[in-house]
Amino acid sequence: MSCTIEKVLADAKALVERLREHDGAAEVLIEQTTTLNKRVEAMKQYQEEVQELNEIARHRPRSTLVLGIQQENRQIRQLQQENKELRTSLKEHQSALELIMSKYREQMFRLLMASKKDDPGIIMKLKEQHSKELQAHIEKITEMTAVMKRAIEIDEQQGNQEHDRIVKLEQENKWLRKTLQITRASFLNLHKEDAAESSSHSASSVPNTDLSLRKS
C-alpha cells in the first residue's frame, strides 16, 4: 500500500516538473507572439507611409515604385511564414498540454483512491469535478482555435489586397497570444492545485510518503 502511494506521488511529481517545462515553453511562445505583433504594427505604419509617398510618387521613376512593392511583399510573406510556424508550435503545445493534463488527473485520482478507499462518494465527486475542468479547458482551446482558423480563411479570401491582409495577420496574432495566455493560466492553476493537494495529503493521509519524497 505504502509503495503504491509513493509511486503515485513520484509520478505526480514528475508530471509537475513537465508542466513547469511546458510553462516555460508557453512563455517563449508568448514573447514570440508579442514580437510578431510589434512587427505587424510596424507594417501598418509602413503601409501608411507608403500611402503618403504615393502622393508624390508620380514624379519618381516607375522602377522605384516597383522596388518598394517587392520589398513590401517580401515582408508580408516573411510575416505569414512566421505566423505559420507559430501556429504549428501552438498546436504542438496544446497537444502536449492535453496529454499531460490527462495523465496528471489520472495520477491524482489514483492517489485519492489509494488513500480514501472507504469513501467512494468523495472519489466520484472529485472525478466529476476533474472531468468538468478538463472539458472546460478543451472547449476554450477549441473555441480559440476555431476563431484563429476563421481569421486565416478570411485572410486567404482577400487575394492581393495587401492592406487587408496585414489587418487579418494582426488579428491572427492577437488570437494566438490570447490562446497562449489561456494555456499559460491553466498551467499555473494546475501547479497551484498540485501544491495544495500535495500539502494536504502529506499532512493527513501519507506522512511517511512525504518524508520519502524529501529524501529523494
Curated annotation (Swiss-Prot):
UniProt-recorded name of the protein: FGFR1 oncogene partner 2 homolog
Localization (cell): Cytoplasm
Family the entry assigns: Belongs to the SIKE family.
Pfam families from the UniProt entry: SIKE
Coiled coil: 33-102, 131-185
Claim: Isomerase is one of the keywords in the record: no
Organism: Xenopus tropicalis (Western clawed frog)
Organism domain of life: Eukaryota
Span list, region Disordered: 193-216
CC annotations in GO: cytoplasm
Record-linked InterPro entries: SIKE (IPR008555)
Annotated Polar residues bias: 206-216
Keywords: Coiled coil, Cytoplasm
